[in-house]
C-alpha cells in the first residue's frame, strides 16, 4: 500500500468509528444528525485526521420552514 492509501484507510476507519459513536447506521449520513451534532462530528473528525489544523469548512444540512433541505458552509475553529 502507498502512503496515500494508508492515510485514506485510516481516515475511513476513523469516520466509520465516529458514525458508530454518534449512533449512525452504516446507511445513514452525517447529515442525518441534528445541526449541532453535524458540526461536532465534523470537528472531531478533522481533529483526529488533521491534528495540526486549526480551522476547517463544515458543511451543514438543515431544513427550512417549507421542508426543503438547505446546505450551508461555515468556518469552524478547532
From Swiss-Prot:
It comes from the Viruses. This is Uncharacterized protein ORF43.1 in regA 3'region. It comes from Enterobacteria phage RB51.
Amino acid at each position: 500500500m502507498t502512503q496515500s492509501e494508508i492515510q485514506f484507510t485510516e481516515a475511513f476507519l476513523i469516520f466509520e468509528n465516529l458514525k458508530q459513536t454518534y449512533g449512525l447506521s452504516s446507511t445513514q449520513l452525517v447529515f442525518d444528525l441534528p445541526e449541532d451534532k453535524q458540526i461536532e462530528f465534523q470537528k472531531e473528525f478533522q481533529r483526529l485526521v488533521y491534528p495540526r489544523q486549526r480551522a476547517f469548512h463544515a458543511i451543514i444540512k438543515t431544513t427550512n420552514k417549507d421542508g426543503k433541505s438547505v446546505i450551508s458552509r461555515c468556518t469552524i475553529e478547532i
